[in-house]
Curated annotation (Swiss-Prot):
Gene that this sequence comes from: fdhD
Cross-referenced SUPFAM superfamilies: Cytidine deaminase-like
Any one cellular-component term (Gene Ontology): cytoplasm
Entry's Gene Ontology molecular function annotations: sulfur carrier activity; sulfurtransferase activity
Keyword Heme: no
Swiss-Prot/TrEMBL keywords: Cytoplasm, Molybdenum cofactor biosynthesis
Ligand binding (Mo-bis(molybdopterin guanine dinucleotide)): 253-258
Subcellular location: Cytoplasm
Name assigned to this protein: Sulfur carrier protein FdhD
UniProt-listed PANTHER family: FORMATE DEHYDROGENASE, SULFUR CARRIER PROTEIN FDHD
Superkingdom field: Bacteria
Similarity remark: Belongs to the FdhD family.
InterPro entries associated with the record: Cytidine_deaminase-like, FdhD
């Protein structure tokens, strides 16, 4: 399914020689990002409905299953089928019997909005999850970050067309981009990338995201054992607390030649 459509719209603007707006009924062609409800169905039982871009949904299903703790490893999933239905898309996931039994014990239904929200959470004390503390297995040369930022920007093909999507990319320790995923929801883009990361053998490196660093972005990164998250915008206080607790290197406001290091500075050098 295509991730963008063309549509004729009305627009307004000021001309160079006047402070007045031109007529509101001028028309132009615009490109809109496609946003569609995607139902994640485990062994025939609907678990979650998320608003997504309709691409790379197998990777999304794998990443979501990992970051939500439904599975521990890709091998816990026996098969994934993407099926278009009349009002959206169903991603049909076949879990191992053991994982499906565990899921049924605390199955919940939810409707997400552009990938936001703590998925399937009913009580406040379920929000704050604890994971094993991340080991420090590498150091990253901050001088390489500028080229990574350039690569992130120029490879956001859907974002360049529509201006309506987020991107998450994975870079190795030499600053080479290994994968990039875009979606209308930043959490969904991250789940897609983490699905790729898991099925690719968990290469060492870091995630660069076009969004802010929210608590859930940090939680998903930590859950999949990635040691470093860099974002274009700021981090929230809870995201920083989560990063510090789990020894995640977290950088925000990443720009050419600068950035805020919120936690995990021992992985960085210049």
């Amino acid at each position: 399914m295509q991730c963008w459509i063309r549509q004729t719209i009305n627009f307004f603007r000021k001309t160079k020689n006047t402070e007045k707006l031109t007529a509101l009924l001028q028309q132009k062609e615009d490109i809109l990002a496609v946003e569609i409800p995607v139902s994640l169905v485990y062994n025939g039982i609907s678990h979650a409905v998320m608003m997504c871009s309709p691409n790379n949904l197998e990777d999304f299903a794998l990443g979501f299953s990992l970051t939500e703790g439904i599975i521990n490893k890709p091998e816990d999933i026996y098969g994934i089928d993407v099926v278009e239905v009349c009002n959206g898309i169903e991603v049909q996931i076949e879990l191992s019997s053991r994982k499906f039994m565990a899921l049924k014990e605390h199955r919940r239904n939810l409707t997400g909005r552009t990938g936001c929200g703590i998925c399937g959470t009913e009580q406040l004390n379920q929000v704050y999850k604890t994971f094993p503390k991340l080991d420090c297995t590498f150091q990253f040369d901050l001088n390489l970050l500028d080229s990574c930022l350039i690569d992130l920007q120029k490879n956001q093909l859907l974002g360049c067309k529509t201006g309506a999507t987020h991107a998450c990319a994975f870079f190795d320790l030499y600053g080479s981009m290994l994968a990039i995923y875009e979606d209308v929801g930043r959490h969904v883009a991250l789940d897609k990338l983490l699905g790729w990361h898991a099925k690719s053998g968990k290469p060492r490196g870091f995630i660069l995201a076009s969004s802010r660093a929210s608590y859930e972005m940090v939680q998903k990164t930590v859950a999949c054992g990635v040691e470093m998250l860099v974002t274009i915008s700021a981090a929230t206080d809870l995201a920083v607390t989560m990063a510090e607790k789990h020894n995640l290197t977290l950088i925000g406001f990443a720009r050419e030649g600068k950035g805020n290091i919120y936690s995990g500075h021992l992985r960085l050098h210049n």
